[in-house]
Amino acid sequence: MAASVLGSLLRTFRQAVPPSASGQVRGYYVDWRMLRDLKRRKMAYEYADERLRINSLRKNTILPKDLQEMAGDEIAALPRDSCPVRIRNRCVMTSRPRGVKRRWRLSRIVFRHLADHGLLSGVQRAIW
């Protein structure tokens, strides 16, 4: 008896809740490029302090040239993805790398689509 009541409750719940709201439709990352960028962001954060200290030694002109060259070698020995220049801003919905509005983290195409349909709070079309 309890199993049938539970089953009927579960069926009514599934009908009441749309399928997109009940579970995740696809993976968290849109594609492999976004995952690669996330790995680069983590590595850049991990090595940020060390990279800052070594670069300050390398760019300090008061120190001897030998020490500056050693610091340059240490920077070269760090992982390539630890450099913050390799981080690319991407759209969180499409993973598009260009034309990304930094404040919303959306590409210009997705931004305009969502703004036109009133799905971005505080954003409205310019009318004059």
From Swiss-Prot:
Keywords on record: Mitochondrion, Ribonucleoprotein, Ribosomal protein
Origin superkingdom: Eukaryota
Keyword Ion transport: no
Predominant cellular place of this UniProt entry's protein: mitochondrion
Swiss-Prot/TrEMBL GO biological process terms: mitochondrial translation
InterPro entries in UniProt: Ribosomal_uS14
Gene3D superfamilies associated with the record: 1.10.287.1480
Gene Ontology CC terms: mitochondrial inner membrane; mitochondrial small ribosomal subunit; mitochondrion; nuclear membrane
GO molecular-function term, one example from the UniProt record: structural constituent of ribosome
Subunit and partners: Component of the mitochondrial ribosome small subunit (28S) which comprises a 12S rRNA and about 30 distinct proteins. Interacts with LIAT1.
Sequence similarity: Belongs to the universal ribosomal protein uS14 family.
The protein's name in its UniProt record: Small ribosomal subunit protein uS14m
